From Swiss-Prot:
Gene Ontology biological process terms, A to Z: glutaminyl-tRNAGln biosynthesis via transamidation; translation
Transmembrane segments: none
One cellular-component annotation, GO: cytoplasm
Membrane recorded as keyword: no
EC number: 6.3.5.-
Reactions catalysed according to its record: L-glutamyl-tRNA(Gln) + L-glutamine + ATP + H2O = L-glutaminyl-tRNA(Gln) + L-glutamate + ADP + phosphate + H(+)
Annotated InterPro entries: Asn/Gln-tRNA_amidoTrfase_suB/E, Asn/Gln-tRNA_Trfase_suB/E_cat, Asn/Gln_amidotransferase, Asn/Gln_tRNA_amidoTrase-B-like, GAD-like_sf, GAD_dom, GatB_C_1, GatB_Yqey_C_2
Identification of the protein by name: Glutamyl-tRNA(Gln) amidotransferase subunit E
GO molecular function per UniProt: aminoacyl-tRNA ligase activity; ATP binding; glutaminyl-tRNA synthase (glutamine-hydrolyzing) activity
């Protein structure tokens, strides 16, 4: 696919950055914000939508309720009745509010006089209450990226959702350990005009948040939601972008999807002379189960054995439309299939542009065409499944196909790991918000503002200069400044330097962990506690700094206790080093006799393989050089 001209397309992108705050307590109770894999029980919920304060039911909430799911919640040991929705929320976490106010100050936002906590209806099971508590803290402001001002619309403080553990067709299991962790949400204006600019803005906001020293790190602690539109399209919400580097690809693919959908609309209307009314009036749907009684298609056989039925739906003039690619490996037919999976919970759908295939023969395709009365330019969709679900599926298929005459549907999509997206649910509306009646309004006074000033992040340029003054090279200082481990670096440097150089700490965090990953290590196990265990051993002269790299490799590949691995790399004495070198020299005396001091590179490699960082590299080199110089030659 050729690259699109985003300025001509009128691309507009807004970001919603969600970041967990690193506070000791949750937003509305005193429970710990540490995730806990252990639990002492479960509770069960069925959730249903409620009317908003204006008497309406939100479409997204209605969509989730119609799934009829049961929700189970693991109760960790650090959980209380607030998370189970058996007790009213306590007062809002003052520390979390101060951090959000500090971010608002740095973004030049207008802080509200009084904070009102609202309930945002969410009944996908991620909140036991059926709603998420959220509150606007500031509005307006800006972030400057490469000289361009990107507007900030709102800054909010809200509670994070429960952590999903597993999911099946009928029930979803969550853990309550994440529910209620304070979360800052920063929403930008749709001022971003290229995919690459979106990544830079997200990075800049993420950097600002890290510079507060009060945000959590790791998978799931930060996510970016995108709002993307082009001229003639609509604002599409894309949820759950976990990796910063995926942002440009996702935006490119969404812009392409909207562009292709608008092209389909233009072709149907202006080139094929069709309209929604014409196609709708000539839709034909028939049960076609009898045509596939002797099929060789494994997919169809499986459904028929379960008592499923097959229906065919004719769409006048749609030949070639279902197979039209909207983004890499995702076609218009894929969009319809996504709708059916999400809205009717059926997976068996085929369209005329991909058949014969999947074990469906050309003879079976011709039989379908004959039964449905398919003309030369017509298309059809086959859908397979349970009779009751088929009713919903057929309705949704017709709705989505006919929407091709409108263009781009207003929907919420979910980001996939390959940079594409798929339909998630209808877009929520204004009917999902109403006031939280259990929490009184919170006045923003001088005391909370003064508290917030202690968290206002430094300017990145100022922070970079300070890192360089600590002895780091500009390159290493920049890596640490941009690293999610910046706060850990500062904490360890304050605690262990000057005895342990900040350069060693920074190199460990930025280079040695990457080295462990390159050697096949699972670096997710390298926690802050593991890093500190290693730095502490170095501080107490138990290990050499040259052993850190190998310790991390061994730990991330073996998963043995870190203390055991550190003990294996304990410093050797000078006497032991001398014995090792003498032994290797004696074993390689023939090479030394042949090459003399030129044999050094061979010998040092053998020595290092035995020493494995248990002595400082310089000491090993100097000792070997001296011994080789005085080694007797024949």
């Amino acid at each position: 696919m050729t690259e699109l001209d985003y300025s001509k397309l009128g691309l507009k992108v807004g970001l919603e950055i969600h970041q967990q705050l690193n506070t000791n307590k949750k937003l509305f109770c005193d429970c710990s914000t540490t995730l806990d894999e252990k639990h002492h029980g479960t509770l069960q919920r069925y959730l249903r939508p409620s009317f908003s304060e204006i008497g309406e039911i939100d479409t997204a909430a209605l969509f989730e309720w119609q799934k009829g799911k049961k929700y189970l919640y693991q109760i960790p040991f650090n959980s209380c009745l607030v998370e189970a929705d058996e007790e009213p929320p306590h007062g809002l976490n003052r520390e979390a509010l101060a951090v959000v106010l500090a971010v608002a100050m740095s973004l030049e936002s207008n802080i509200v006089d009084e904070i009102y906590v609202m309930r945002k209806i969410v009944i996908d099971g991620s909140d036991t209450t059926g709603f998420q508590r959220t509150s606007i803290v500031a509005m307006g402001g800006q972030v400057i990226v490469e000289g361009k001002k990107i507007g900030i619309q709102t800054i909010a403080l809200e509670e994070d959702a429960a952590r999903k553990i597993s999911e099946s067709a009928n029930e979803t299991m969550y853990s309550l350990d994440r529910l209620g962790i304070p979360l800052i949400e920063i929403s930008t204006a749709p001022d971003i005009t290229t995919p690459e600019e979106a990544e830079k803005v997200a990075f800049r906001i993420g950097q600002l948040l890290r510079l507060t020293g009060k945000v959590k790190r790791g998978i799931g602690t930060i996510r970016q939601d995108l709002n993307v539109s082009i001229q003639g399209g609509v604002k599409t919400e894309i949820k759950g972008v976990q990796r910063l580097e995926l942002i440009p690809e996702i935006i490119k693919n969404e812009a392409r999807r909207q562009y292709e959908l608008l092209k389909i609309k233009d072709e149907l209307v202006n080139k094929r002379g069709l309209s929604k009314t014409i196609v709708e009036n000539e839709i034909k749907e028939l049960e076609l189960t009898h045509l596939f009684r002797n099929t060789n298609s494994k997919i169809i056989k499986k459904e028929l054995e379960k008592g499923g039925l097959i229906y065919g739906i004719k769409f006048k003039g749609f030949k070639g439309i279902f197979g039209r690619e909207l983004m890499p490996n995702r076609r218009f037919g894929t969009e319809i299939a996504d709708y059916v999976r999400a809205l009717a919970e059926l997976g068996g759908i085929f369209h005329s542009d991909e058949l014969p295939n999947y074990g469906i023969t050309s003879e079976e395709v011709e039989s379908v065409k004959k039964e449905l009365g398919i003309g030369e330019n017509d298309g059809f969709v086959l859908v397979i499944g349970d009779k009751e679900k088929l009713k919903v599926a057929i309705t949704k298929i017709k709705e989505r196909v006919l929407y091709a005459f409108v263009g781009v549907p207003k929907e919420t999509r979910v980001a996939l790991d390959d940079g594409t997206t798929k339909f998630m649910r209808p877009q929520p509306g204004s009917a999902r918000m109403y006031p939280e009646t259990d929490i009184i309004p919170i006045k923003i006074d001088e005391s909370i503002l003064n508290f917030a000033k202690s968290f206002v992040p430094e300017n990145p340029e100022t922070k970079l200069r300070k890192l360089i003054e600590m002895g780091l090279s500009k390159e290493l200082a920049t890596e640490i400044l941009n690293s999610p481990r910046l706060d850990l670096f500062e904490e360890l440097s304050k605690k262990y330097s000057p005895k342990v150089s900040p350069i060693v700490i920074a190199t460990t965090l930025e280079n040695y962990i990457k080295y462990a990953k390159s050697k096949g290590g699972d670096i997710s196990v390298i926690t802050d506690e593991v890093i500190e265990e290693i730095i502490n051993a170095l501080y107490n002269d138990k290990i050499s700094k040259d052993s850190i790299q190998e310790i991390l490799v061994d730990y991330s590949t073996s998963k043995k206790p870190i203390r055991n691995i550190v003990d294996n790399y304990a410093k050797i004495t000078d006497e032991e080093l001398n014995r090792i070198i003498d032994k290797i020299l004696d074993e390689n005396k023939d090479i030394i006799n042949q090459k003399g001091e030129k044999a050094f590179n061979v010998i040092i490699g053998k020595v290092m393989n035995v020493v494995k960082g248990r002595a400082e590299g310089k000491k090993v080199v100097d000792t070997l050089k001296l011994k080789m110089k005085n080694y007797p030659r024949t």
